[in-house]
Structures are given as C-alpha cells and as structure tokens.
Amino acid sequence: MSSIDPYQYIIVEQQFSHKFRVKVVRAENVTKGALGDLLDTPDPYVELFIPTSPESRKRTRHIDNDINPEWNETFDFILDPNQENLLEITLMDANYVMDEKLGTTSYNVSKMLKTGQTETVPFLIGKATNVYLEMALEVCTKLDLRFSLALCDKEKLFRQARREKVTLGIKKLLDMEKPRFLPSTPQEVPVIAIVGSGGGFRAMVGFSGVMKALYESGVLDCATYIAGLSGSTWYMSTLFSHPEFPSKGPKEINAELMKSVSSNPLRLLLPQHITNYIQALWSKKANGQPVTFTDIFGMLIGETLIPARMDTKLSELHEKVNEAQCPLPLFTCLHVKPDVSELMFADWVEFSPFEIGMAKYGTFMTPDLFGSKFFMGTAVKRYEENPLHFLMGVWGSAFSILFNRVLGVKDTVGGEHYGGRA
C-alpha cells in the first residue's frame, strides 16, 4: 500500500478542439448594383456563420456610406475537427427598416486550411466586390475543463498544509504529549470529514448545533473536510461567508442566524426586495442566461440567511482555507433528468471554493465558469460568476422534493409518491 500515490493523475480520455480565428480586414468596391448605388451609398457589414460551431454566428459593425470599408475585427470559432466545418460569408447592407443581403460565399475550413497555418484570402462576392479575411487554425491544447480523477493542485496544497493543523488538533484534543502516540509521518495523519444531511431548515438548524459542539470541543480542528447537502449547505454557506469566521465561532454566528430565521418571511415580499429580484433576473436574462425558479428560490434563501452578503461568490470562500485554517467545505447536490426517476439516474456534483465538477466523469471547472457554455472542454460563452445565494438554491434539493409532492409526481417503483412518508 505504501507504493500507491494518492495524488497520482488518472487521465480521462479527452478530445481537443480547433480554434478558428477570422479577422475581417476590409472590402473593396462594395456595390448594391447600378441602380441601388444611385439611390444610396452602402452601409456594409459582414456576417460569419459556421453551423457546426456552438457560437455559430458573428458579425462586424456596420460602416456608414463607405464602398471600401475597413473593419479589422477578429472573431474566434471553436470547431470539432471530426466534422466538416463550412464558413459562410455574407455581405450585408444596414438599413433602418430591413437589412439587405448583397451577396454570400463559402469556405471549407476543414479541407482548405491546415492547423498552424495563417492565410489572407480575398473572397469575391457578386461580380465586383472583394472581402478580405485573414484566417488561422490552431489546436486548443489548453482547455477550460480539467479532465482527471485526481485532486486539483490547489486542493493538494491545502491537504498538505492541513495535515499539520490536524496533527496539532489531535494532540490538543487527546492531550497527547508523547510523540509516539501521534502520527509519525504525513501518510499517517487521518483524513476526517464531517458530513451534514439534507432536509431544509430542519437540517440547517441541526447542523448548526453540531458545528457549535465540534468547534468548542476541538474536533473541528481535526477535520480536513466539511461536506453537506441541501439544508446543511445553507448553514455551511452562512458560516464560511461570514467575514469574521473562523475567529468568530459558530456560537456567535448561530445567534445571528437565529435572528434571521425568526424574522417575518413576509419582509421578503417588500417592494424594495421585489425590485431587486426583478432587476437581477432581468440582467441575467439580458446576458443570455436561462432564468428558472431556482433563481427566485436562491434569492429568497439568500435574503433570509445572508442578506448582507448577497454579492458573495463561492470562489471568494478560498480566503477561509488559503492557509488551511479551516476544513475545506464541500457543497453537494444531485444532477438528475426531468423525465427519468432519480432512482435510475442521479449523478453527484461537488462544489468547493477551488473547483466544481463530477467525479464520476472526471470533469471539473473553476467556480467562475459554472453556468458558462462549453464545447469540447472550451468555454465558448462566459458569464459572470453566479452569486453564492444562487448556488444555495441549486443545493436546496429539499425544494425539488417538496415541489414534486405538490405536483403529485409519482416514483417509478411501486407507484408511491416520492417522499410520501415522512
């Protein structure tokens, strides 16, 4: 067993995509035809479209009244090298009512451009117009997703630093002054995890008492991880997002939490809160992100438990563990399918200040990329990192169970209502 490296990299098979970079340089002799040119000078722009690319459509700005425009705008497409990728180039004329198509042509990227090659190609559109594109193709060797079953580098460093804290914690807890009773090598230091169950506010309140006892008894100093689901993650979020934790212990933070939970829930429906909800949802929708009831649920949970920390993000919690001063929090939830029973399909998703991912598939990302659009391991559309209260809504699995009860969703086994027996 001593020959086994617990940090060995187990590489998961992955495919590399291609990055196709197109620079729309300029156009010459843009024309709308003899009659059209007499009536109006073109306001040209160029549209690029690759059907096989996830972010398939790009366009330049339009330039007013110019038959020899210069754009010098660069666009990136992520391509699957196993598919035939065809670039469609369309020259358009901007108008107030409806834009006019002046012409189109195509270019087979897969057949005509090699990786590592850069070309400047003139494309004839119509009978007289030339559009000049500078194109390059390269292999995306640096991916935004990490494909591995091993721990990330930051967590490895945390584990190494936490060993020393745990050793001191065990010595203090058990009052061991004789070194021979303590772990003699780093490998002998036990990895202890504290796990909280799900169950909404009931689980949150129960876990708050457990954490208070573990903190005051010194057991928390012997732990490497704290993991939770649903209501337990709500308490973990409240604890780790508190600006004075860990210098201020759970006893004081629990007193603040008690006031928050005891407050009138109708305050969440006050006009100023409703306005904030609408503005946040509208901003997210305007950025192209999906808006679901989870957003609203997360806002309600956040306003109840962490009203002064609604802008806190998961990645910011690394400050609590950057010197291994606290156990590493692991927030979990289940990935399920709406049309398949969770008994048949359910994948665990784990969240930490370092990474978010699924160990089953060996796929992880940094917290700021959660919710982004990916293609073959590359983030093709990035969004601002989700706030912590949104993730609290995601982790709130109890809400999904209650919602299924309201809808009367039946489990596939035995025909009983899911969770019908308390």
Regions from the PLM with identified roles:
Residues 20-24, 44-48, 60, 75-77, ...:
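Structural signal for hydrophobic/aromatic residues that build the beta-strand cores
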Residues 197-199, 223-239, 331:
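Catalytic nucleophile loop
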Residues 1-4, 28, 32-41, 64-72, ...:
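C2-type phospholipid-binding modules
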Residues 125-191, 247-248:
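N-terminal charged/capping segments associated with class I S-adenosyl-L-methionine
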Residues 55-62:
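Short Trp-Ser/Thr-centered turn/loop motifs at beta-strand boundaries
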Residues 219, 242-243, 249-422:
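Patatin-like phospholipase A catalytic core
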